Design a protein with these regions (language model features):
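Extracellular glycan-interacting surfaces
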Residues: 1-371
Length: 371
């Protein structure tokens, strides 16, 4: 069970603690500044906060004392872009605009394995994966993934350029990583990043022309998670539905949920591989809860069926949307947190059956994480 929750928002980082009377907010950190990602390193408790300051660039901060004091870390830096004899071709439906070789945002941040002290992984926009071996003091771009020829086909999903928003480190083998790209599919390495394979068999992209519907390199997984106890079981909330894999992401099967299979986020039960939670929405045109009613859907049978959970959530009309990193489950599998685009934060202590609103007046929430 985790007694601390990090909430990254458009106007700062909030830290909540579980007390005898419930979850309590403490004074905000980086007030007024957009915090795109936060991490509590499970190995040593170090906190990390990634900020996107627009014209002032991307910043990364680190705290070794629970947030009492913060120090600046290095940020990932792309190498110089090679000069080419010819300018890039103009964008076409089959050729998206070339991504810049410069950091736009830290979109995901994960600790390495338990046997890799100091190792961090950062997924970024415009699509580079970076590794730090020293707790954020320095970063190295993973060139084998960045140099894949398929990367030229990746394109932005929600942002102008593609980005890595999900990184799953296999707890049984730290050299086995799975990452998800919007829009660029799911990629895996078994050797710590030396070689990569696109593994999206079974996914489909209905937003593409029919002949490219099954193209693995342009799939749009919105969020990728794995079951901690059985990492070969993975879940994806995709632009075109919900997908589940039982063979470490090599094959995917879709699942149909009501009131919608569209959404941005998913959380996997850490102990029960058949259980996962989603937050459904209306696809494409509206991006709102179905019929203006916020619910959480839960499957406890591997996606064969879903139940809509709404006790404690606002009745219709309600237009809260939950971003990719806006839903989290703790290591017990019983406590969940959910933060919305309208600044509402809820906690459930019983696996999603009942929700309690901690605050309805926070800034728009980008990410919630226990730790």
């Amino acid at each position: 069970m985790n007694d601390r929750l990090l909430v990254a928002s458009r106007k700062g980082l909030f830290i909540l603690h579980r007390r005898a009377g419930g979850w309590q907010l403490t004074a905000p950190h980086f007030i007024g500044e957009p915090v795109s990602m936060a991490l509590a390193d499970p190995r040593d408790g170090t906190l990390y906060a990634a900020l996107n300051l627009g014209h002032f660039g991307v910043k990364l901060w680190r705290s070794r004392d629970g947030g009492a004091h913060w120090e600046a870390c290095a940020v990932p830096v792309y190498p110089p872009q090679p000069e080419t004899a010819d300018p890039p071709p103009p964008p076409t439906p089959d050729q998206p605009p070339a991504a810049p070789w410069s950091l736009q945002q830290i979109w995901s941040l994960e600790a390495g394995g338990a046997d890799e002290a100091g190792v961090l992984w950062a997924g970024t926009i415009p699509g580079g994966l970076f590794r730090s071996a020293d707790g954020g003091d320095s970063w190295t771009l993973n060139r084998p993934l960045w140099d894949r020829p398929e990367r030229a086909l990746w394109f932005g999903g929600g942002y102008d350029y593609p980005g890595i928003h999900s990184i799953c480190v296999d707890p049984r083998d730290s050299r086995h990583l799975t990452v998800a790209v919007s829009c660029g599919g799911v990629w895996q390495t078994d050797d710590g990043g030396e070689h990569w394979t696109c593994t999206t068999l079974g996914m489909h992209a209905d937003y593409m022309p029919p002949e490219r519907r099954d193209d693995p390199t342009i799939q749009d997984p919105h969020r990728l998670v794995q079951c901690a106890a059985q990492p070969e079981v993975m879940w994806v909330q995709h632009h075109n539905g919900i997908f589940r894999s039982v063979d470490a992401g090599h094959h995917w099967e879709d699942a149909v949920a009501q009131p919608s299979s569209f959404g941005f986020t998913v959380a996997a039960h850490p102990l029960r591989p058949d259980t996962a939670w989603f937050v459904p929405a209306v696809k494409d045109e509206c991006r709102i809860p179905v019929e203006g009613r916020l619910v959480v859907t839960r499957s406890r049978d591997g996606g064969a069926s879903f139940e809509a959970l709404s006790e404690g959530l606002p009745p219709a009309p309600g237009y809260d949307l939950v971003y990719r990193h806006g839903l989290a489950v703790d290591d017990s599998g019983e406590t969940l947190a959910m933060g919305s685009t309208t600044g509402a934060l809820w906690i459930s202590e019983d696996g999603g059956g009942r929700w309690q609103c901690v605050s309805a007046h926070l800034p728009p929430i980008y990410c919630v994480r226990f730790g």
